[in-house]
Amino acid sequence: GASVLIRGKSSWNDAPVLYVVDGIQVNKEAFDAINIDEIENISVLKDASAAVYGSRAANGVILVTTKRGENGRPKFSFSTNLGISTPTAYPELLNAYEYATLWNEAQTNMGYDINNSSDAHLFYNDEQIQKARTESSDWFGETFKKHSLNQKYNMSVNGGSDRIKYFMSLGYLHDEGMYDGIDYKRYNLRANIDAKINNYINVRLDLEGMESTLEQPQVASASLFEYVVRRSPLEKIYNADGSYYDMGSRHPVAERDDSGYKRNKKNNYRAKLGFDIKIPYVDGLKFNALFSYVRGANHSKSFLTPYSLYLLGDDGSVANERIFGKTSLSEEMYIGNNMTSTLTLTYNKKIKGHSMSGLLVYEQFESLGSTLGASRTNFPFTSIDQLFAGGDDEEQSNWGTPAQDARKGLIGRFNYEGKYLAEFSFRYDGSLKFHPDRRWGFFPSVSLGWRLSEEAFMKKFSNLDNLKVRGSYGILGNDAVGGWQWLTNYSFGNAYIFNQAPIKSIVSGGIPNVDLTWEKTATFNFGVDASIYKGLLAVEADVFYK
C-alpha cells in the first residue's frame, strides 16, 4: 500500500505516521482496513501540537473520527460502487518482426557480418523474418489483464433518542488484481452506541470487526513483470498441444498459473468502552475513561509447486521436459492482543471573554503476541496442501517468536484563549524497549498566538474577519527500535559433534546497549491565518523547521 509522510522524514528509524481512530492509537494496517463509509472526519497534526500524542508522533498524526448515531427514527443507507482498474501506461514492447530486424541491426553494429558463414548463425534469416511478420507472441497481453473489476458494498443504519443513539454498518470489498490469481476480499462490521445514563454520565460502546483474505500466485509481481519484458516475441508461449513451450528459462504464464499460491487471512476484533463524567458541583470539570481491547490473528500459507516446460518433436511427441521448482509448504500463524487504557481529567473555564482549559491524562498500552510457523518440502504429490503430506522428515522445520510491548505516559496541557493564545503541553513517557534507567523521556511543547484582528488599531479594516500570527515549538520522542537491545540475546547456531552426538551451539547476538534511549525530534513552526469578506477568502501560510 501507499506510505504517508507528513512534512518529510524526521527520524533515523523508519517511524511511521501515527494513526489515532476515535481516541485510540492504531497501526497503519488497521487504518488501511477501515471502511471509508464509516469515517466522519479526518484531520492531520503536523507541528508541535502532535507532542501530546507522545512516543509515536514524531512524524505527525492522522486523526480519524468514525460516524455516530443521531436523534430520530432509524435511517437506513445502502451504497454500492463498481469500478474498473487499468494500468496508467503499458510498456511498448516490440513485435516479432521489429525484434528480429533490430536484433540483426545490433549484430551488425557489433561487427558481425550476415554474409560471413561463420557469423550467419547469429542473425535471423529472411525466412525467419518473413515468418515474424505474421507470428508474434504477446507475452504482456497473455500474462496481464487490460483491466480488473473492483466492487464495494455498504449498508448502515443510524438513529436514536435522547437516551440512546446508535450507528451500525456492514461493508464488503472485493478487488481483483491485474493478473489472474490475485483476489482480495474484506468484510467490515461496526457498531457505535452512545447512552446517556443521567445528566452527569454518558457511556460509549464501540464494537468493530474486520476479516480479509488475500490470495495471489507464488511469483512476486515485480518478478513476473521482469520475466515478461525479458521474453522475445519470437518465442512461442504454448506448444501445439497447449503445453508450455520451453524457451530455456522461467515461463511467465506458468509462473502465474502453476507455481503455487500464497494466501493470507487476517481478522481483527476491537471493543472500546468509554465513560464521560461531569463532576458534580465543579463547573467545567470532567473525567473521561476509555478502555480498548483488540484481538487479532494472521494466518499465512505459501505452497510452492513445480511446473514443466516442453519441447516437442516433429511428430508432436515430447522431446524434452524441463521442471522448474520443487514442492514446499510454509505456514505461519500470529495471534496477539493489545489493551489500551486512557484516563483524562479536563477543566474549562471562561471569564469575561477569556477561555482557560487544563488537561491531565494517564495512558497505558500493553501488547502481547506470538508467532508459530512450520514448513516441509518434497511433497510426493501436490493435490494435498497440508503439512502432514510433506516428504522427508529431515527437510522440515518449525519456529516460534513471542512479542511484547508496553508503554506508559502522563500528559498535561494548559490552554489560554482570547486575544492572545497560549498553550503548554508535555508528555512523560516510558517504554519497555529501553533499559530501566533510560526508559522515561520528557517531551514538552509550547504554542503562542496573537489575534491581530481583535486589536483596536485593526478595526478600520472592516472586511477583515480574522488575522492571526502563531508559533510553536515542541520536542517529540520516538521508540521505533527493536526491543530488549539492552539485554544480551542468544540464538541457536550450528551443531557440533561431542561424544559422537550432535550438540547445538548457542551464539551471542551481540553486545547489549544499555545506553539506548529515546530518539528526539524538535519541531518549530511559524504561521499566519487570515480571512476576509466573512470567510469568502481564507489564507493559511506556514514555515516549519524539523
How should each PLM-predicted stretch be described?
Residues 1, 32-37, 54-58, 182-185, ...:
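Short, glycine-/polar-rich solvent-exposed loops and beta-turns at beta-strand/coil boundaries
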Residues 17, 22-49:
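Short acidic/polar hinge/loop motifs at secondary-structure boundaries
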Residues 6-10, 21, 46, 66-68, ...:
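Flexible glycine-/small-residue-rich
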Residues 45-48, 53-59, 65-68:
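Periplasmic N-terminal soluble interaction domains immediately after the signal peptide in Gram-negative
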Residues 28-29, 51-52, 176-180, 431-436, ...:
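A generic structural signal for short coil/turn motifs at secondary-structure boundaries
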Residues 1-2, 11-13, 17, 60, ...:
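Residues embedded in well-ordered regular secondary structure
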Residues 16, 186, 192-201, 205-211, ...:
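Extracellular/periplasmic, surface-exposed regions of secreted and cell-surface proteins
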